[in-house]
Amino acid sequence: MNILITNDDGYRAKGIRVLSEIMKQFGNVTVIAPKHHQSGMSMAVSLGLKQLAWRELDEEEVDRAAIFRTRADIPAYEGSARWSYLDATPASCVKFGLNTCFLDNFPDVVVSGINHGSNAASASCYSGTLGAALEGALNGIPSIGVSLDTLDPEADFSPVVKYFPAIFRKLMSSLPERKGIIYNVNFPDIPADEIKGVRTGYQGRGRWVREFKMWDPAIYAKLGITPEMLGQSSVPKCEEGEILYTMVGDFLDDPQNTPQADHLLMKSGYISVAAHNIDTTDYQEVSRLQGNVEMDF
């Protein structure tokens, strides 16, 4: 099996290092990840004549560049992974891979992650992790996004190491004939022995409130985020008259959600699996509109 891996936290993040090791047991691993942090990019791509820097890396270089220290939860499987970074969005990384490394034969699967932070509920609309998976699905490739519900750069990924291989096997052994589907897998941030199981659910609904706050270095320090992780050498300086803001916010749950909403399944101690599709048509609404807006001229 040929596997293409990417993420939106950048090649230096712990999550993608863990994922690359997990996937070695399933076949040949190629990693093409963003050079810098690209969260919230959804399916954005780098258009036009913008120059995109690409560089091959060996695994020792990846380890030296890592922005994490704890490694006890990183498995070690036989085999190696081909690593490189692209100074572009996650979806562009997949595009680049399909047009270079896999030009003659597409990979058997695209796996994006492991994301530092939940991509359940409305977060999936913004997710660069899922945007990369959607790019794979757009090309007819089975694609999976994997996330752990914590922003901690030193996160303990042992629950993903323990349970994702079985989830992956089940998903790959029961693929539908229809193309264009991605699987959004979200792990709760609890010890592996406290996880109750795996449940399928739907994309929960909600929105963020109080999203913008004036810049305070303590916000990023609390999350363990440095300017370098965001592709910056320092905090941007203000021009005259400017005020720096950062986007954080609090998630407000939609009261119409049922317990089968993916983010609520996680809250209940389950790994949630939701199926998304590149076709965003609301067919029920299309049927309703047929009798309301269709006209002949």
PLM region spans:
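A cross-family phosphate/adenosyl-ligand binding-site feature
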Residues: I3, K14-N99, F106
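C-terminal accessory domains and tails appended to enzymatic cores
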Residues: M172-R178, N184-F297
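Glycine-rich phosphate/pyrophosphate-binding loops
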Residues: A123, A137-P159
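Short glycine-rich anion-binding loops that position phosphate/pyrophosphate groups of nucleotides
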Residues: D9, H37, T89-P90, N115-S118, ...
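Alpha-helix C-terminal capping segments
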Residues: G97-D104, G131-P142
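Short beta-strand segments
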Residues: T6, I32-P34, S112-N115, V146-S147, ...
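Glycine/threonine-rich flexible loop motifs
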Residues: S118-S127
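Active-site glycine-rich loop that binds ribose-phosphate moieties when present
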Residues: Y126-A133, V146, P159-M172
